[in-house]
């Protein structure tokens, strides 16, 4: 790099050149970033997808634009590789980016920002600007594809840096991502099998409940009819190879009906019996009065008295 092009007394230039040397002296296996020769405020970078996520093994290229008063103001970031977490060719909104200068600290560097960017990859976007939220299987597909070729972007000089960075990260990203297992697509079939196995028993339960509910509202001669109907319903729902549940329905329905009616008889109010006895007594009294009136009207009482005298 031709350092003589820039004023080394400029705080921003001095800081950028210092970070370049530090980056070259202490390279990372997780990222690589280099400034352009013609503009040290413009950087190219690539990061590895974080491990144990759908991004693992992916290589994601992007660009960094440093402000003229760096490091007192934050840089802006843009992803060039489709990734399913951030939009491409769009400045992304992060707490370390120029969208939130209030969070930026001058002690942070390009290295700090790239480490933070890797950490942001598997987080929820929450509607932030420049963010997308692809399903995990699509993100894994993009991670696999990202290893094939680096993105084509900018001038030949920039493309040369992009290719160099890609080869470096590819040599470090030894874990080749594989498509995620199709757990979601297999789940419905598994659930369907389980559901088909449970359906007969569930149907029996429905028949039992309907039979019991019906016996609560009918008399003794109707219980037999409802029980027979329950048997027919169970026979149509339950496979022929499982006759026992249908028999069990009949027994349960009949026994339950008898038990419920017995409970009702036991719970009959005592007041009903008292009213019955009172009615009987009243009827007898009325009959006695009517008999006396009849005897009196026919003179039986007078003749009886004359005989005594």
Curated annotation (Swiss-Prot):
Segments traversing the membrane: 275-295
Membrane-topology annotation of the record: Single-pass membrane protein
Disulfide bonds listed in the record: none
InterPro entries linked to this entry: Ub_conjugating_enzyme (IPR050113), UBQ-conjugat_E2_core (IPR000608), UBQ-conjugating_enzyme/RWD (IPR016135)
SMART domains named among the record's database cross-references: UBCc (SM00212)
UBC core domain sequence ranges: 11-166
Keyword Transmembrane helix assigned: yes
Sorted UniProt keywords: ATP-binding, Membrane, Nucleotide-binding, Transferase, Transmembrane, Transmembrane helix, Ubl conjugation pathway
EC number: 2.3.2.23
Record localization: Membrane
Single Gene Ontology MF annotation: ubiquitin-protein transferase activity
Chief localisation class: membrane
This protein's GO CC annotations: endoplasmic reticulum; membrane; perinuclear region of cytoplasm
Any single biological process term in GO: protein ubiquitination
Summary of the function given for this chain in its UniProt record: Accepts the ubiquitin from the E1 complex and catalyzes its covalent attachment to other proteins.
Family to which this protein belongs: Belongs to the ubiquitin-conjugating enzyme family.
UniProt-recorded name of the protein: Ubiquitin-conjugating enzyme E2 32
Organism: Arabidopsis thaliana (Mouse-ear cress)
Lineage: Eukaryota, Viridiplantae, Streptophyta, Embryophyta, Tracheophyta
